[in-house]
């Protein structure tokens, strides 16, 4: 127990994780972390917290009941269409879709928490215009949970960072729109959303808008972000111009009218002077090769240009990769903020989705009690109603209580 407790404690505070009262839970968490260490061979920075599961919070549904109720897939075809999830899922993000599925598979049984969710959905239906604006801002958001996992495992490519930037650029307007709501759950979501404007600015300043997938091909870093990148990039694209300017300058300076800058793979770049102009060659020209009718020279300035031009591409690719990794690492350092925000966005997406479904289908808000009575008047099966055409669905009347058990 102490060994596993030490392992969990090294990753996250046991007290903060809620495991301080769960000896068996600490052992299980420690065993899982050890397994991940041994199999992933990598940092577990994406695991920022452990949340204990309480059987008193959620309804326990066995696998047979889950299948027969067709909560997330149909019994025969094993497809989403025709299931309860199919009716309820109007989410805009992958995170929201996963969270809604978890809601359906693990229904709450705590009356207070159920009513908090009802309050959030009710508020969203009372502010239809704001709700639709929220949907528009949710739609472009990529899967932040998966993106930050790739970032922390150092497998994210430049396009992942652009997707991350485009996603978090939606956060400020979403956070602002949530000012219109007063309910506890929506306020908690607003507080948990971190706009992360400095990370958005970092990626916007550094990474090309349409970068390659590979991090080893160059073309990753924007102009103006790093002076050396700009210098190497200019050397790569403007090398011929620089050489032509140097050639013209040396002709004028020396008076050698037929002086030319040439290149071969053996000697690199050189200044070629015919024998008829040998007497005009200045002292700072260093002889590199002698031919039958000409001499080849190098100057410090030409050597500097040669090093810059020939090494520019390799240096550029290497430097861009290093800068990209630096940006990626800065994002990875904010994993806790990003995960908290991703969870908040996922929950918001779910509540907006449920509000849309309730509005479109004219669902009413049930009154929750602890009396043990289920009393439904004008009940409609959400799935059957959708599958039957021409308004043929017949409303149901159901009363279930302890003495009578069931009456329809």
Predicted regions and their residues:
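Single conserved hydrophobic/aromatic residue that forms the stacking wall/gate
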Residues: 1-9, 14, 398-408
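Charged catalytic and DNA/RNA-contacting regions of genome-maintenance
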Residues: 10-123, 139-152, 156-245, 373
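Charged, surface-exposed helical/loop "interaction arms" that form contiguous linear patches used
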Residues: 153, 157, 167-170, 223-224, ...
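Extended, charged coiled-coil "arm/hinge" scaffolds of SMC/Rad50-like chromosome-maintenance ATPases
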Residues: 208, 291, 295-329
């Amino acid at each position: 127990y102490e060994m596993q407790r030490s392992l969990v404690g090294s990753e996250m505070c046991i007290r903060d994780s809620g495991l301080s009262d769960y000896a068996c839970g600490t052992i299980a968490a420690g065993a899982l972390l050890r397994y991940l260490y041994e199999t992933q061979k990598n940092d577990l920075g994406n695991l920022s917290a452990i949340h204990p599961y309480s059987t008193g919070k959620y309804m326990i549904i066995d696998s047979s009941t889950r299948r027969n109720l067709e909560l997330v897939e149909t019994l025969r075809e094993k497809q989403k269409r025709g299931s309860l999830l199919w009716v309820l899922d109007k989410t805009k993000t992958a995170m929201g879709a996963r969270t809604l599925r978890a809601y359906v598979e693990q229904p709450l049984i705590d009356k207070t928490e159920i009513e908090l969710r009802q309050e959030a959905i009710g508020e969203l239906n009372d502010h239809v215009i704001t709700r639709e604006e929220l949907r528009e801002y949710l739609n472009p958001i990529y899967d932040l949970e998966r993106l930050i996992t790739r970032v922390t495992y150092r497998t994210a490519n430049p396009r992942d960072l652009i997707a991350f930037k485009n996603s978090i650029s939606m956060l400020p307007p979403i956070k602002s729109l949530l000012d219109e709501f007063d309910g506890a759950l929506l306020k908690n979501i607003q507080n948990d959303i971190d706009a992360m404007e400095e990370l958005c600015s970092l990626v916007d300043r550094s990474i090309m808008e349409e970068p390659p997938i590979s991090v080893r091909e160059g073309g990753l870093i924007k102009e103006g972000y790093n002076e050396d990148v700009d210098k190497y990039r200019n050397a790569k694209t403007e090398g011929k111009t620089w050489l032509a300017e140097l050639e013209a300058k040396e002709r004028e300076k020396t008076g050698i009218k037929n002086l030319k800058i040439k290149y071969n793979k053996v000697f690199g770049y050189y200044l070629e002077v015919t024998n008829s102009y040998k007497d005009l060659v200045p002292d700072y020209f260093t002889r590199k090769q002698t031919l039958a009718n000409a001499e080849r020279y190098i100057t410090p300035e030409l050597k500097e240009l040669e090093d810059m031009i020939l090494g520019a591409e390799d240096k550029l690719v290497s430097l861009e990769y290093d800068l990209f990794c630096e940006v990626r690492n800065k994002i990875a350092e904010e994993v806790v903020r990003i995960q908290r925000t991703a969870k908040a966005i996922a929950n918001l997406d779910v509540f907006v989705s449920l509000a849309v479904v309730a509005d479109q289908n004219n669902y009413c808000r049930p009154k929750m009690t602890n009396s043990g009575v289920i009393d439904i008047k004008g009940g409609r099966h959400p799935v059957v109603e959708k599958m039957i055409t021409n308004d043929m669905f017949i409303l149901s009347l159901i009363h279930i209580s302890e003495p009578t058990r069931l009456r329809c």
